[in-house]
A protein has these predicted regions:
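Structural signature of the Rossmann-like NAD(P)-dependent dehydrogenase/reductase core
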Residues: 5-6, 68, 100-105, 140-146
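Residues at the starts of beta-strands that form the adenosine-phosphate
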Residues: 2, 25-27, 100-101, 138
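N-terminal Rossmann NAD(P)H-binding glycine-rich loop of SDR-like oxidoreductase domains
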Residues: 2-23
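Conserved Rossmann-fold NAD(P)-dependent oxidoreductase catalytic core, especially the SDR/UDP-sugar
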Residues: 62-70, 84-120
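NAD(P)H-binding glycine-rich loop region in Rossmannoid oxidoreductase-like domains
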Residues: 47-84, 111
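NAD(P)-dependent short-chain dehydrogenase/reductase
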Residues: 118, 122, 126-165
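Active-site regions of enzymes building and remodeling cell-envelope glycoconjugates
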Residues: 38-50
Length: 165
């Protein structure tokens, strides 16, 4: 099975891939710390902003599963670009009805208080569901607490503890 991990993938480690996707070919977009490993069937690349190049990856690999890690999984994470990346990936999924997509996001959309962040999270969830309905892509949204890491330099807690040293 070929799996694409995209979005806020700085938290993805080789161990996570081995445990979560044994015997799968895994393409990771956006994690600059993870190195490709042919023996373990891991290809790691920076996120591709050029739609033509992203299309070539979708033509090269026949992804059956896509896991998109939202920027909202990082506490005080970067909010720009998420909707565009989601749109690009979902647009390329329309040719393959067998793809299953899991969108991992934060819990902001379930809060009763409306803010800019809750609106953006809700909009991203709506984009995933609408594209899923429009192209008959099996999509699931999983709301989870914030992720944290002692090695991912973009992580809020990593920055906090580094400054405290």
């Amino acid at each position: 099975m070929e799996v694409l991990l995209a979005g806020n993938t700085g938290y993805v480690t080789e161990t996570f891939i081995e445990e979560s996707f044994p015997e799968c070919d895994v393409v990771v977009l956006g994690n600059e710390m993870l190195k490709s490993n042919r023996k373990k069937n891991i290809l790691s690349r920076p996120f591709i902003k050029d739609e033509k190049e992203l299309k070539e990856i979708f033509e090269t690999y026949e992804f059956e599963r896509i896991v998109y890690f939202s920027n909202y999984l990082t506490m005080h994470g970067r909010m720009t670009g998420e909707l565009e990346q989601l749109r690009q990936i979902l647009q390329l999924c329309k040719k393959n009805k067998e793809i299953r997509m899991l969108y991992l996001t934060g819990q902001e959309s379930i809060y009763n208080i409306t803010s800019g962040k809750t609106l953006l999270v809700s909009a991203a969830e709506n984009v995933v569901m609408e594209y899923g309905n429009m192209y008959q892509i099996n999509t699931k949204i999983l709301r989870i607490p914030h992720l944290y890491s002692a090695v991912y330099t973009q992580d809020f807690f990593y920055k906090l503890f580094t400054e405290a040293e």
